[in-house]
From Swiss-Prot:
Residues 1-19 form the signal peptide. Belongs to the peptidase S8 family. The active site is at 137 (charge relay system), 210 (charge relay system), 549 (charge relay system). This is Subtilisin-like protease SBT1.5. Residues 20-103 form a propeptide. It is found in: Secreted. It comes from Arabidopsis thaliana.
Length: 775
């Protein structure tokens, strides 16, 4: 049979595949037992291709092969093909592809990273020198000064990566700063057909801007002067200014395809990166169906830290993505910088707004006619309220400021539509869901964004002015005030930042932390204007963007600094240091606020809090986790042996793991339990944790407890005495609830924390208790 497969394989090499273009086929990622390859096949590629040749349909071609973080291949298959492959004795799993999407300066200073400090994280880590951060994104614009290699030493000897040259990306585009650049489009082209190279680059070059922006946040060099359209003037710098960068382009016009993302993980690990930064996400699925979770496990198994964006689905609950416990999941917070652009109404009222519009402004001494898109005649109301394409009547918009509701199309696109229809300016109003969270945009006309309450105020003014015969027609102007520093309160949890609880494993608190993600200045390509709309002919070396996409590379860069300062720390130890030293108060000394509501935020919004780089360098204790600990976690999550092999490439003894504990006993730096309560009763559980001393020898840590409301919490022992650095000690946390009666379907979440303190360091872990009364 093997000889027949090999002969058939030779035939298929010269036969074009039709299944890739079949409307009934999808891309699948196939996990194979690579040890089972028959000796007759010279490579795994030959073996995989011969297996495909045995399928009933026209034999498909392989898109990617994987041999580092995952063993197998991806191919375009019909559901019948996929089912047939799953019956193959050496096929472990067949995973349908998911299409992911992007989660789209002053932040180093806000984080306390100053190049002038003589004894800080930057100095201790030599600014991240010789560590390589792999950025899986939309590529890179290598000519930007953020990627200049002046002053850097030779490329690290360990580096095995390449700079893939093309017509628009010469090999010389890489240097001692940008040490590698690759692109992966097989999955994209398998679904969409051959790329249109007039609209995007078939190379590592960035045609979107997102990848250039995130790469420079993580490791851009110091650049002065830096600004965009006159805003945020100052020094631009990444978190790890001397770290090296490798760009892995996986995102294209229609999205980021799992088969390409997994290929990027596979290649990045083989190339020798130290940190992987991923500002991409999709729908939460079980980990064994999640290509990002699978790729990330393969990376951390090799000692590579993986930072991933939490998503921009906030402020609603259960919106967090990239939730596997071996990834560090990053939400977004604000910094102490703002770009006020306020609306002055004809009745004298001022409405706060933000904008980074940099063109000719409105006449400050003049008031302009004001209209609401949703009340214009001739439209359907809904479309015109959102200022969608084709919804506005130029005769009713020309020469006026137009109020548009946020949603459906991008904020910058709304401005382009208003401008095309003759509008002089635009105000974007948040809806109830977005609340008061504001994002500054580089608009193509004078424009600003206001919160939900401000939008209501403006609509009310327009309505009352239009109805009153005695009053004048509604008017307004926009007053641009430039850049404002020292904003209080800050940080605040950004409105868009995705929230917990963790929809896949509520016992693992996600997001882990938040980092700067609102109105972040970073490098930008020449391909596209700062607004992102195609008609924007302005060009700038830097741009201001917002999203957890921007927060993630902050943590990626910080991880590189910590890895450089502590080369022996594992990815879990680095995450533990970030989590247990995070803070939850703002620069006014008050609990961090939720931007969307103006109320106090919670652990479901920020995880353990906002990262504190200086304290993370010296956390005292860390909660370390091995690959086998994660396997036990998966066993206790009731994953099958096949599921676990798909993720970890290892066989699992789940009988032993399940006897040893429960899913909450993963040695994570936070604690979360979900009680399913039936009637009025007391509930209890316990957590077992082990901490490693990375502080001082002969140190003693004592416990401090703030129990969640309605619970009793004890810790045994109450004191941990360490004789040496590297010593490990264990403790048990016991949680008991009081009798609480909930109505059917109700959920009650209470939070507290435990702190191990040696008098100098506070090792803080949040403790979350969730009570659910089933229907």
């Amino acid at each position: 049979m093997a000889f027949f497969f090999y002969f058939f394989f030779l035939l298929t090499l010269s036969s074009p595949s039709s299944s890739a273009s079949s409307s009934n086929s999808l891309t699948y990622i196939v996990h194979v037992d690579h040890e089972a390859k028959p000796s007759i096949f010279p490579t795994h590629f030959h073996w995989y291709t011969s297996s495909l040749a045995s399928l009933t349909s026209s034999p498909p071609s392989i898109i990617h092969t994987y041999d580092t973080v995952f063993h197998g291949f991806s191919a375009r298959l019909t559901s019948q093909d996929a089912s047939q492959l799953l019956d193959h004795p050496h096929v472990i799993s067949v995973i349908p592809e998911q299409v992911r999407h992007l989660h789209t300066t002053r932040s180093p200073e806000f984080l306390g990273l100053r190049s002038t400090d003589k004894a800080g994280l930057l100095e201790e880590s030599d600014f991240g020198s010789d560590l390589v951060i792999g950025v899986i994104d939309t590529g890179v614009w290598p000519e930007r000064p953020s990627f200049d290699d002046r002053g850097l030493g030779p490329v690290p000897i360990k580096w095995k990566g390449q700079c893939i040259a093309s017509q628009d990306f010469p090999e010389s585009a890489c240097n001692r700063k940008l040490v590698g650049a690759r692109f992966f489009c097989g999955g994209y082209e398998a679904t969409n057909g051959k790329m249109n190279e007039t609209t995007e680059f078939r190379s590592p070059r960035d045609s979107d801007g997102h990848g250039t922006h995130t790469a420079s946040i993580s490791a851009g060099r110091y650049v002065f002067p830096a600004s965009t359209l006159g805003y945020a003037h100052g020094v631009a710098a990444g978190m790890a200014p001397k770290a090296r960068l490798a760009a892995y382009k996986v995102c294209w016009n229609s999205g980021c395809y799992d088969s390409d993302i997994l290929a990027a993980f596979d290649t990045a690990v083989a190339d020798g990166v130290d940190v992987i930064s991923l500002s991409v996400g999709g729908v939460v699925v079980p980990y064994y169906l999640d290509a990002i979770a699978i790729g990330a496990f393969g990376a951390i198994d090799r000692g590579i830290f993986v930072s991933a964006s939490a998503g921009n689905g906030g402020p609603g609950a259960l919106t967090v993505t990239n939730v596997a416990p071996w990834m560090t999941t990053v939400g977004a917070g604000t910094i102490d910088r703002d770009f006020p652009a306020n609306v002055k109404l004809g009745n004298g009222k001022m409405i706060s707004g933000v904008s980074v519009y940099g063109g000719p402004g409105l006449d400050p001494g003049r008031m302009y006619p004001l209209v609401y898109g949703g009340s214009l005649l001739g439209g359907d109301g809904y479309s015109s309220s959102l200022c969608l394409e084709g919804s506005l009547d130029p005769n009713l918009v020309k020469g006026k400021i137009v109020l548009c509701d946020r949603g459906i199309n991008s904020r910058a696109t709304k401005g382009e539509i208003v401008r095309k229809n003759g509008g002089l300016g635009m105000i974007i109003a948040n809806g109830v869901f977005d609340g008061e969270g504001l994002v500054a945009d580089c608009h193509v006309l004078p424009a600003t964004s206001v919160g939900a309450s401000g939008g209501d105020e403006i609509r009310r003014y327009i309505s009352e002015s239009s109805k009153s015969r005695s009053s004048k027609h509604p008017t307004a102007t926009i007053v641009f005030k430039g850049t404002r520093l020292g904003i209080r309160p800050a940080p605040v949890v950004a409105s868009f930042s995705a929230r917990g609880p963790n929809p896949e494993t509520p016992e693992i608190l996600k997001p882990d932390v938040i980092a700067p993600g609102l109105n972040i200045l970073a490098a930008w390509p020449d391909r596209i204007g700062p607004s992102g709309v195609t008609s924007d002919n302005r060009r700038t070396e830097f741009n201001i963007l917002s999203g957890t996409s921007m927060a993630c590379p902050h943590v990626s860069g910080l991880a590189a600094l910590l890895k450089a300062a502590h080369p022996d720390w594992s990815p879990a130890a680095i995450r533990s240091a970030l989590i247990t030293t995070a803070y939850t108060v703002d620069n006014s000394g008050e609990p961090m606020m939720d931007e969307s509501t103006g109320n106090t935020s919670s652990v479901m919004d920020y995880g353990s809090g906002h990262v504190h780089p200086t304290k993370a360098m010296d956390p005292g204790l860390v909660y370390d986790i091995t690959s086998y600990d994660y396997i036990n976690f998966l066993c206790n999550s009731n994953y099958t042996r096949t599921n676990i092999v798909t993720i970890t490439r290892r066989q699992a003894d789940c009988d032993g793991a399940r006897r040893a504990g429960h899913v909450g006993n993963l040695n994570y730096p936070s604690f979360s339990v979900v009680f399913q309560q039936y009637g009025e009763s007391k509930m209890s559980t316990h957590f077992i944790r082990t901490v490693t001393n990375v502080g001082d020898s002969d140190s003693v840590y004592e416990i401090k407890i703030r129990p969640p409301r309605g619970t009793t919490v004890t810790v045994e022992p109450e004191k941990l005495s360490f004789r040496r650095v590297g010593q490990k000690l264990s403790f048990v946390v016991r949680v008991k609830t009081t009798e609480v009666k909930l109505s059917p379907g109700a959920t009650n979440v209470e939070t507290g924390h435990i702190v191990w303190s040696d008098g100098k360091r506070n090792v803080t872990s949040p403790l979350v208790v969730t009570l659910q009364q089933p229907l």
